[in-house]
Structures are given as C-alpha cells and as structure tokens.
C-alpha cells in the first residue's frame, strides 16, 4: 500500500484540512493517508482547542490513520518540529510527505533546502545560532532574505524538505498551494474556508459561523468541551513562582537568560495577556514566548529532549489504516506501533502522558492516555 503522510495539528479540523488530505491522496497516488498530529499542546504555544482524542475522531473523517507527534516536537520551533515529524513519517514507512504552502512549488523548496544544508556547515551559521538568533533569521541574514522565506508555511515546508534530505531520502516531498485565508485573521469571511485562528475565535465567542467552514460530518464533535486558554494562567503563574531561576534555565527552549525576565514579570501579571505584554521584545516572537511558557508549565527539560524515535503512538484508524498497520507490523517486527497505553508501553510516552494530565487539570476533562483506547472507525467515502 502506498502511503502519504501529513504533519498536522488540526487545531481544530476544518475544510482546509479536508482539501489537504484529499489532494495528498491524489498527488501522491496514495492508498492510505497518515496524519501525524500534535497532541494536547500545539506549536503556537497553546493547549489544543480540543483534546487529541476528539481531534483524532475529526481527522478520521478524512484520513486513514492518526498518530501522535511527540510532545517535545509539538512545542518546538519549526526545525525540530519538522525533524521529528519526518522521523515519524519515516518510521511509518511513508512514501510521500505532502504539506501545504503559500508557494506550492516543490522544486523551489528542494533547491533552497540543498543550499541551506550546505550553509549550516559554515562557521558563521554556528556563531549566529549560539547568539540565540532564530533559524529563519540566520538564513535570511546569510542568504539575503529569499522570497520563499517570507511566509510561515513556506518556512515550515522548507524545514520538512531539509529534514527529508538529511534523514529520510526515500520519502518524496510534495507541496500543495494553500487556500488564501489569512493565518491570523479572526473573522470568518469565506463561505468554505477559514483559518484555525478564526475558528477558535468563533468557538470562544460562541459564534456559529464556524459551521460553514467545517465538514457537516463532524459538527457534533465541535459540540464537545473545548479548551479556553484563559483557564491556564493560574497554573502557569504558580509554576513560575515556585520554580527557581536555575531550574527555569534548564527548560526546553529557554535561552539567553529569559528565565530572569520570567521571574521578574510574573509577580506583576494578573492574566496571560499582561504577562505576554511584559515578556514581548523585538528579539522574541509572541509564538516563541508562548512555547517557552508551555514548556515551563509541562516542566519539559532540555536534557530530556528526545533525539531518537523509539515508538509511535497510534491514536486512531479506519479499516484502511488498520490494514496498513497490520502490514507495517509484518514488515517491521522490530518497530513499536503502540495502540494502547498501559504499564508496559507507558515509558515510551512519558511527556505525552504528562501533557494529557496537565491538559485535564486545566480543562477539567477526564480522557487520559490510559483510559482511552485506540479509536477505530469504519471506512467512509473519500
């Protein structure tokens, strides 16, 4: 069976994601599509609006198999996010990786990726990296701001192609052009497509406009409890106040003395917005700060950051996905494809289990990694 992988967040799932999965199946001539999905926390540095089990059910309306992107990767910048997304795709023996971009031209990505992979070996690149500059900024300084690196999905797409060239050359990358919805636009203006930002805003303001940009088949899932990020601030404040500067410095993604800025800002902040206003500088993007804060909340330490992939958590599958998984287990008996978390398999997923526990503490939800078995559904018309 030919497999196309999609690295996703589905925060939450909407018509744009349906289009992505359908195009991936077509462009890669795939028999099966795998969604490699962030779990309880996402790359923008927030808890996902719906928990990973609800989002898995949403994804199975279109995809055949849903697996979890490791939690450390989900709360990392594009390079590490992409690196582990590609590791999971390779572990699942994907033939293709299909991503959305503003460009849509895979040739442009491949040419620039080769150029950048050579630049990374340059001493000046390493110096700038040690100075704490972001990866896209370093590339722009050394290459004169390539046009391809002017939009967020292009930047992430480039990271995917780089990761494939470095560690998974058997995977063929494809890019499809995204529908033009402004990524940070909070209004739903199109009658078919909208950004995740706009849909989350609609959910939090009880605006039913989301119904026109979400598949009818999953409307009932949207009625399930969802997370409001305002709920997390008291837990975050307690964590920062009760953690020493030395221990904060050891947290994944914390750098350049940012722990001191955290300690000095938290006492005078009464809510998340106030804290962000105090922490924001030209040096740090809003998203980068939020990722730091979520890593603090979860106590994700830099020394525990995974470098290898020892198992993959299977969150859900339809009948096609189940056949593909059976084939994988036969072809790769040494690999661990985990469908249920128990005492034996839990050690492979400690960060993910912790993320679910904290997510539930904040939201009051009760679905855990231990009491939620792999989700199985019947095939649907694609």
From Swiss-Prot:
Subcellular location: Cytoplasm
GO biological process: tRNA modification
Main location (coarse class): cytoplasm
Catalytic activity, as annotated: cytidine(34) in elongator tRNA(Met) + acetate + ATP = N(4)-acetylcytidine(34) in elongator tRNA(Met) + AMP + diphosphate
Origin superkingdom: Bacteria
GO MF, one annotated term: ligase activity, forming carbon-nitrogen bonds
Purpose of the protein: Catalyzes the formation of N(4)-acetylcytidine (ac(4)C) at the wobble position of elongator tRNA(Met), using acetate and ATP as substrates. First activates an acetate ion to form acetyladenylate (Ac-AMP) and then transfers the acetyl group to tRNA to form ac(4)C34.
Entry protein name: tRNA(Met) cytidine acetate ligase
Gene behind this protein: tmcAL
């Amino acid at each position: 069976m030919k497999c196309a992988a999609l690295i996703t967040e589905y925060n939450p799932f909407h018509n744009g994601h349906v289009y992505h999965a359908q195009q991936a199946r077509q462009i890669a001539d795939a028999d099966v599509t795998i969604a490699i999905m962030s779990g309880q926390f996402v790359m923008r540095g927030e808890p996902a609006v719906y928990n990973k089990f609800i989002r898995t059910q949403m994804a199975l309306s279109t995809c055949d198999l849903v697996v979890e992107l490791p939690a450390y990767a989900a709360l990392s910048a594009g390079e590490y996010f992409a690196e582990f997304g590609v590791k999971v795709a390779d572990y699942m023996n994907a033939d293709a990786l299909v991503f959305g971009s503003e460009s849509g031209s895979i040739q442009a990505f491949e040419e620039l990726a080769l150029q950048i992979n050579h630049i990374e070996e340059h001493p000046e690149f390493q110096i700038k990296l040690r100075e704490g500059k972001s990866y896209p900024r370093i590339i722009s300084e050394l290459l004169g701001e390539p046009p391809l690196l002017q939009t967020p999905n292009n930047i992430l797409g480039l990271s995917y192609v780089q990761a494939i060239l470095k560690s998974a050359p058997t995977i063929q990358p494809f890019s499809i052009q995204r529908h033009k919805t402004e990524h940070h636009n909070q209004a739903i203006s199109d009658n078919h497509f909208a950004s995740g930002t706009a849909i989350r805003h609609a959910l939090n303001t009880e605006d039913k406009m989301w119904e026109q940009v979400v598949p009818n088949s999953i409307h009932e899932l949207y009625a399930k409890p969802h997370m409001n990020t305002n709920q997390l601030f008291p837990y975050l404040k307690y964590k920062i106040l009760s953690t020493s500067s030395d221990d904060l410095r050891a947290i994944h993604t914390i750098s350049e003395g940012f722990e001191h800025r955290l300690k000095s800002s938290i006492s005078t902040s009464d809510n998340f917005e106030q804290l962000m206003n105090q922490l924001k500088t030209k040096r740090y993007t809003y998203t980068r700060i939020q990722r730091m804060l979520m890593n603090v909340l979860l106590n994700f330490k830099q020394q525990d950051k995974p470098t290898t992939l020892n198992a993959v958590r299977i969150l859900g599958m339809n009948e096609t996905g189940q056949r593909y998984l059976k084939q994988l287990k036969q072809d790769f008996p040494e690999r661990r494809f985990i469908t249920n978390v128990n005492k034996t398999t839990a050690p492979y997923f400690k960060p993910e289990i912790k993320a679910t526990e904290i997510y539930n503490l904040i939201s009051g939800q009760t679905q855990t990694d231990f009491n939620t078995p792999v989700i199985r559904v019947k095939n649907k018309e694609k």
